[in-house]
UniProtKB/Swiss-Prot annotation:
Protein's gene: RPL7A
GO molecular function ontology, one term from the record: structural constituent of ribosome
Keywords (A to Z) from UniProt: Cytoplasm, Ribonucleoprotein, Ribosomal protein
NCBIfam families documented for this protein: uL30_euk
Highest taxon above the source species: Eukaryota
Alphabetical list of InterPro entries matching this protein: Ribo_uL30_ferredoxin-like_sf, Ribosomal_uL30, Ribosomal_uL30_euk, Ribosomal_uL30_euk_arc, Ribosomal_uL30_ferredoxin-like, Ribosomal_uL30_N_euk
Organism: Candida albicans (strain SC5314 / ATCC MYA-2876)
Protein name, entry field: Large ribosomal subunit protein uL30
Location relative to the cell: Cytoplasm
A single GO cellular-component term on record: cell surface
Function: Component of the ribosome, a large ribonucleoprotein complex responsible for the synthesis of proteins in the cell. The small ribosomal subunit (SSU) binds messenger RNAs (mRNAs) and translates the encoded message by selecting cognate aminoacyl-transfer RNA (tRNA) molecules. The large subunit (LSU) contains the ribosomal catalytic site termed the peptidyl transferase center (PTC), which catalyzes the formation of peptide bonds, thereby polymerizing the amino acids delivered by tRNAs into a polypeptide chain.
Family classification: Belongs to the universal ribosomal protein uL30 family.
Length: 241
């Protein structure tokens, strides 16, 4: 029985298709290996961060015990980070505090942002103090905010941080590949804090459970809600998150 030869053009086409399929399979294999390696890097970093946080916490506890044992006082390190949330309205705001609220991207009620605490930012926040509540967020508060209400600015769009790939695509050039990298950069106020802060969309919080205090617009130390509440910001954020 005679063998039917395929036309040369068909043979060439089949060879090209086979070559393309082989190249795709090879590329897929490389991608799979790269993704596996990346997952390992992300996992190892998260474990290292947890170890770092735990050791820092133990160090503070030990320092406090040592201070107590020697009959002296433990002085907390100067805070480097604040979380600022706008709690007062739109109307009749003088130009200076209005400008500060715009600079902080607090253009809506219950919007919140992380701010690196410096002399300059402290003075800015002071100008806006009658309209905001702020304080020193804990690691737990930062993590809860980012995981529950974290959105990034991608091509001027508000995109949920539902995948590490979104973070890597926008912050990978700063070696920030995952949501835990992002949280670590905020909590430690790392070298790329500004880039991370600018990438994060202002957090949209809710009115606190049970509402604000009756004297909401007085300073916190006077029984109101505005101004610096130091560590007590964590309780407010928990109510609003």
């Amino acid at each position: 029985m005679a063998t039917t030869l395929k036309p040369e053009t068909l043979q060439k086409k089949e060879k090209a298709q086979q070559k393309t399929a082989e190249e795709r399979a090879a590329a897929k294999k490389v991608r799979k290996a790269a993704n596996k390696e990346k997952r390992k890097v992300i996992f190892d970093r998260a474990a290292a961060y947890q170890k770092e946080y735990t050791e820092a916490e133990r160090s503070v506890i030990k320092a406090k015990r040592d201070a107590k044992a020697s009959n002296s006082y433990y002085v907390d390190a100067q805070p480097k980070l604040v979380f600022v949330v706008r709690i007062k309205g739109i109307n009749k705001i003088p130009p200076k505090p209005r400008k500060v609220l715009q600079l902080l991207r607090l253009t809506q009620i219950n919007a919140g942002v992380f701010v690196r605490l410096t002399k300059a930012t402290s003075e800015l926040i002071k100008l806006a103090e009658p309209y905001v509540a702020y304080g020193y967020p804990s690691l737990s508060t930062i993590r809860q905010l980012v995981y529950k209400r974290g959105f990034g600015k991608v091509n001027k769009q508000r995109i949920a941080l539902s995948d590490n790939a979104i973070i890597e695509a926008n912050l990978g050039k700063f070696n920030i590949l995952s949501i835990e990298d992002l949280i670590h950069e905020i909590y430690t106020v790392g070298p790329n804090f500004k880039q991370v802060s600018n990438f994060l969309w202002p957090f949209k919080l809710s009115n606190p459970n049970g509402g604000f205090r009756a004297r909401k617009f007085q300073h916190f130390i006077q029984g109101g809600d505005t101004g610096n509440r130091e560590q007590f910001i964590n309780a407010l954020v928990k109510q609003m998150n």
